[in-house]
Amino acid sequence: MPTVAHTSEADRELFARELDSFVPDVICDAHMHLWAKTQLPPTGWEAFRQVEEDVIDLAAYRRRMAELLPGRRVAGGLILPGAVAATGEQLLSQNELVARQVAADDGWRGAMLVSPEMDPEYVRGEVRRLGLSGLKCYHVRSGKAITWDADIPDYLPEAQVKVAHEERLWITLHMVKARAVADPSNQHWIRTYCETYPDMQLILAHAARGFNPYHAIQGLAALRGLPNLWCEMSAVTDVGACEAIIELLGHDHLLYGTDFPVSHLRGRCVAVGDSFVWLYDDTLNWDTISFQQVRPVFVGLESLRVLKQAAWHQRLSDSQVEDIFCNNLSRLATP
């Protein structure tokens, strides 16, 4: 299984060689997770259990980020609950952990983990009680036998989007379906929600789930002209999706994110045909696949290389790069 790792010499060398001159001094993280081991359900991703700490709070996150981005200051961002499949008391505990971290640091905003069966008025009351400013939905909560093919309303019902509009919340959406943002159903619901509820800010996770960049290249044109639509680029390691966002939606609607702790796994995601595959440090024997030495580095570094190449291809200025790393999120985040 992949493990949440500490920095290696290969990680440090790559950052110094390729990224130190690109990453601004101050960053904001639009997609990161906090959790406690006791909040993980029995079927939770084992990588979350492999960390040394029992509770991954902002202090633990900052220690890890100092390894990924040496010399940089993380000024704030959006906190998402980490145990996205949690239920019952574990789910409540997740949301309360996020709320405590938000209350202790003005630079951060937090999301409430929601399930489609939650009454919208319960969602409204909990967001207010906990001092949160966003919602986090996830397809595993859809109730569908095959959650990877769920329609957006199956795990993000319109009644909850209406609450987000009325409370001026942001929503982080990790869409599914085989072709992601190129799927007509996903396009329909994203546009419908954004146009019907303009005071809701919708963030499409992972470059509109552009793990296969051709889905983003082919699908994002259908979502032009939505001022409350954003994309964050966490954990995307193939070139193309970030360029499509900048080209079709504008650099001012692209957000930097890490998807911590995924940022601290070693490997990358690779487009294959009309899909994609994740290759981690334990997926295959890296010592035997090439005539030369191959050593995977942090996913978070691979995604930064992709963002750097997108900025270069789109001829972004330094100030536009700084927008992606922090300023755009400052414009989006609501108090």
Regions found by a protein language model. Name each.
Residues 160, 180-194, 205-209:
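Active-site cradle of extracellular carbohydrate-active enzymes
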Residues 13, 57-65, 94-96, 119-122, ...:
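Alpha-helical scaffolding within the catalytic cores
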Residues 2-10, 89-179, 229, 245:
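Active-site gating/metal-coordination segments in enzymes
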Residues 1-82, 89-90:
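An N-terminally biased module of ancient metal coordination in phosphate/nucleic-acid-related enzymes
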Residues 33-38, 84-87, 117-119, 141-144, ...:
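Active-site environment of divalent metal-dependent phosphoester hydrolases
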Residues 38-43, 91, 123-124, 147-149, ...:
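Short aromatic-enriched loop/helix-cap "lid" or pocket-rim segments at secondary-structure transitions
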